Amino acid sequence: MVDRHEEIKKSYKQLGGIADVYDGIITRSTLIGKIMDSVIWGLDEKLAAKWVNDALAPIPENFSGKLLEVPVGTGVITMPVFKTLDKAEITCLDYSADMMKNAQKRAEAMDIRNVSFVQGDVGKLPFEDESFDIVLSLNGFHAFPDKEAAYSETYRVLKKGGIFCGCFYIAREFDRTDWFVKHMYVPKGFFTPPFETKNSLKERLEKMYEKADVHSVNAEGVFCCIK
């Protein structure tokens, strides 16, 4: 299995001029990133690599279909992966123009030509029903204000038999993270309650999809569903 976490770290170091504090935390490639990852999320290098690799594992290495990523953020996690999927048709959507601009810069710097960018709302996706073979969502649902619409829309645009995969914060798995979410992330507007627990997420996805796997890496809920 390809260690996609290592690919992401290498890309971050090569394109450091585009990166920001968020990228450093995700990749653990900066001192502040390692400190925050350890203190807030309780992650060491091994656990950080695990949630990234687990969340991306459902994407076949030779994937050649249509993939939607929502939200794309800065693209620090996914652009190194998309670079290897040159036969795929990839669409990246984000509500934040600033975040998406960073992702576009990263794609251009890496000469990724099969990715298009769309500014939009996950609660009202501008795509036809059953448009994508894979819908990928990394660290988005804990921030989405209308989570019910987000679940409904990501399901709607996914083809029958398609894959819905990714990860996001779930409550009651790691007390220290829960404390920081309540006292820092929510007040600052980074995260928006209510939050899923591992059990509630598993129950929800099992009702929606033909098959659903949910597990946790500390406070990261990682999921893979088949429609």
Summary of predicted features, one role per range:
Residues 1-35:
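N-terminal, positively charged/glycine-rich alpha-helical extensions of SAM-dependent methyltransferases
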Residues 16, 25, 39, 45, ...:
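C-terminal alpha-helical "lid/dimerization" subdomain adjacent to the S-adenosyl-L-methionine
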Residues 42-64:
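Conserved alpha-helix/loop element of class I SAM-dependent methyltransferases that forms part
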Residues 66, 161-163:
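Short glycine-centered segments of the SAM/dcSAM-binding site in methyltransferase folds
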Residues 66-124:
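Class I SAM-dependent methyltransferase SAM/SAH-binding core
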Residues 123-134:
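A short acidic, Gly/Pro-enriched loop at the edge of an enzyme's catalytic core
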Residues 134-146:
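A short SAM/SAH-binding and catalytic strip from SAM-dependent methyltransferases
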Residues 148-160:
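A short glycine-rich, Lys/Arg-flanked "PGG" loop and its adjoining helix->strand segment in the class I
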